């Protein structure tokens, strides 16, 4: 049963309503920042162990630096190596066959430094779970690549559509390629004024569009947002019209710009140095991020984390629609610019805003999630020989959620 929330209309359209009138009045400059999603950025780094006394390339003179071509394009890696040699010509570079060996060689002091694409940091975590906190970058290079428009556009004011929302596990630039840590399907029917928010666990075992093999859904983001959208479209058996993407910086910045949020915590637990108590709790950006990421504290970790992500998003929605924020939301709009992107066009967004202003309609929304069973197994597309945690989809859950999405699209 859909729950009626008066004029609180859903995560997506509420955000648009809060920001929309300001966007229109201030022109398209901020909106263009959000909708200009035509590039992706790969962040390469030469890293050493954090305990190392090495802090610059000049301290690696005549030493060998290992890198891996297991997933990267040789052309891009050669470009990065050439840039590093311009900085320090005496550097030598050797190839390691796998990311697993690359990490082991660094930790075993076989080499003092390795060159990596940080999108693949998760590949090291099987053997070195705290990899990201145990290394430091001493040199970096970013490669930007043009991305073709992969949206399937419709007339958003009178045709049902789907938006995929991705939360990537990085800080900094929103265009950085990384794993997709949060995965939500937003199904919108502008005719019936219904919205369905469906979450999918990051470790869901699905066929990746680029690899044609199964792996955890989060790894689809390594090849860019277009690959995750294709993967999800194939899994759902329907078009995904648009996508929107946020990262850790986005969440922290947006929550803090809102002056914090009030979350209805469902159980006592601790995570990330923060303590959460049953009941309503005020959270700042970092507290909200830790709350929405934690899974190890719970027996049903992945499913609980998905619910907490929805809790945080709904708390943000409620705060956005409060009179205190509505009368002072230019700071929120400024915060969003640069840490949120979508391939919806500016005209699509303004059309939705104008529709809502004109009809002042009440919307209904429903929250659902795909479920499954957690297993430890080998065979994933990216790390086939490593025994990793995956969530095997529950067939009944898949059928139920696919039908729910179809029902909203079909006006039921």
Label for each model-derived stretch:
Residues 11-32:
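Transmembrane alpha-helices and immediately adjacent membrane-cytoplasm interface residues
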Residues 32-42, 48-50, 57, 61, ...:
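Non-catalytic, solvent-exposed segments at the cell envelope interface
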Residues 10-17, 64, 83-84:
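N-terminus-biased targeting/localization segments
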Residues 2-5:
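Conserved small/polar residues in nucleotide/adenosyl-binding loops
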């Amino acid at each position: 049963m859909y729950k009626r929330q008066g004029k609180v209309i859903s995560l997506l359209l509420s955000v648009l309503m809060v920001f929309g009138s300001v966007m229109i009045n201030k022109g398209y400059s901020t909106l263009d920042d959000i909708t200009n999603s035509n590039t992706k950025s790969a962040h390469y780094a030469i890293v050493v162990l954090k305990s190392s006394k090495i802090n610059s390339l000049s301290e690696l003179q005549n030493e060998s630096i290992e890198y891996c071509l297991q997933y990267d394009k040789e052309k891009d890696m050669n470009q990065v190596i050439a840039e590093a040699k311009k900085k320090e010509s005496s550097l030598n570079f050797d190839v390691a066959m796998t990311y697993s060996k690359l990490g082991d060689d660094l930790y075993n002091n076989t080499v003092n430094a390795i060159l990596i694409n940080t999108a693949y940091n998760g590949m090291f975590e099987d053997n070195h779970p705290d990899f990201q906190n145990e290394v430091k970058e001493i040199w970096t290079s970013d490669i930007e690549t043009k991305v073709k428009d992969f949206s399937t556009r419709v007339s958003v004011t009178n045709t049902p559509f789907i938006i995929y929302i991705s939360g990537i596990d990085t800080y900094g630039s929103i265009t950085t390629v990384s794993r997709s840590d949060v995965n939500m399907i937003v199904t919108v029917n502008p005719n019936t004024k219904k919205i369905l928010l469906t979450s999918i666990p990051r470790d869901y075992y699905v066929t990746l569009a680029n690899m044609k093999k199964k792996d955890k859904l989060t790894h689809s983001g390594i090849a860019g947002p277009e690959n995750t959208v294709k993967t999800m479209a194939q899994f759902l058996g329907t078009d995904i019209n648009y996508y929107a993407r946020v990262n850790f910086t986005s969440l922290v910045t947006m929550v803090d710009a809102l002056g914090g949020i009030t979350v209805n915590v469902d159980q006592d637990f601790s995570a990330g140095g923060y303590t959460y108590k049953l009941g309503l709790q005020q959270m700042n950006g970092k507290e909200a991020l830790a709350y929405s990421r934690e899974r190890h504290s719970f027996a049903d970790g992945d499913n609980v984390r998905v619910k907490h992500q929805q809790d945080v998003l709904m708390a943000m929605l409620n705060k956005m629609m409060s009179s205190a924020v509505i009368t002072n939301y230019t700071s929120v709009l400024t915060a969003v610019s640069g840490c949120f992107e979508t391939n919806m066009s500016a005209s699509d967004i303004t059309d939705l805003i104008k529709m809502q202003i004109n009809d002042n309609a009440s919307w209904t929304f429903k929250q659902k999630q795909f479920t499954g069973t957690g297993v430890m197994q080998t065979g994933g597309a990216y790390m086939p020989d490593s025994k990793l945690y995956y969530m095997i989809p529950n067939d009944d859950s898949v059928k139920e959620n696919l039908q729910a999405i179809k029902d909203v699209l079909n006006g039921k």
